[in-house]
Amino acid sequence: GRYANARGSEPTWTPRAMRSLAEAEPSVFWLDDRSAPPALPSLVGAVEADLVVVGGGYTGLWTALHAKEADPDRDVTLVEAATVGWAASGRNGGFCASSLTHGEANGLDRFPDEFDTLERLGRENLDGIEATITKHGIDAEFERTGELDIAVEDWQVDELNEFARLLAEHGTDPVLLDREQTQALVHSPTYLASRYDADGVALVHPAKLAWGLRQACLDLGVRIYEHTEVTKITSDGAGLALRCPFGSIRGRQVALATNAFTNLLRRLGNYIVPVYDYVLVTEPLSPEQQDAVGWEGRQGLADLGNQFHYYRLTADNRILWGGYD
């Protein structure tokens, strides 16, 4: 798409690349959706709650939801500095994986003694996510399609085989597909082999999942304030006091669910490393384009590279692909 000039200075975009991006829009695909709910009011004045949840991403929403389900009489309040799902929960590829260790290979390397337990808990967690979506009637475009982990280089085929051997030692029966079997599922000449995890990955619309959890919380009586940043937390007798721009909250308990936005507890700063994720999304594929690609199973795909290496179909048959650094 671009080339460096003779002096090695900043690359120049080619005319073809410029044409292909002429109508592209640099926005968050999932959040730019006509089904986005209207913003909720900000907190103005002083309120009290049994539990205050700070952060309106998945962690905060599920914390509030489970707390209210466990004790309907508990007064639960959630505050979000922007809007629900605005940050990482609405800015990802929409792969919902059972792995708690960011991939089984990482789990085997770092937690060999606990790996089997972590895998079991991860499967139970994914089942629980699906159960919550079903219970509350959340339209999150949830598809439990599984995932193909794909080798596109010869050395990656060897890596897949070794990985399968390690999984087998832990009681897993990995499904390995050769070149012909893999290309029969997705028609790419670059695919040399794959491992198919049929049940450990689901695809979702990340923002719709967050918005659905928001509505489930509201239906149960959770108070949610958007555009309400917590600027300070101090002890207040048997509870905690939270300061906001136009109000305050006194909570008996506080759950911080702010991910990288942890300046309220500065001692956590050394444990946070930002990860930048990028995605590109095509226009909806035509029927002819869909036939050319195959991909009838709509599996999530991830090749064994380390940049733009994951891709999937959206509900309206766009191809989304992305990666992180």
Where are these regions (language model features)?
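A non-catalytic, amphipathic alpha-helix used as a structural packing/dimerization or gating element
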Residues: 113, 117-131, 162
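Glycine-rich active-site loop/strand segments that organize a redox cofactor
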Residues: 91-120
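Helical element adjacent to the flavin cofactor pocket in flavoenzyme catalytic cores
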Residues: 158, 165-168, 194-252
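Active-site substrate-recognition segment that forms the wall
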Residues: 94-96, 127, 135-143, 230, ...
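Glycine-rich Rossmann-fold phosphate-binding loop(s) that bind the pyrophosphate
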Residues: 55-59, 81
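Flavin (FAD/FMN) cofactor-binding and adjacent substrate-gating region
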Residues: 17-26, 31-33, 102-108, 131-212
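Glycine-rich FAD pyrophosphate-binding loop
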Residues: 68-91
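Extreme N-terminal leader/targeting segments of oxidoreductases
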Residues: 1-51, 69-70, 74-75
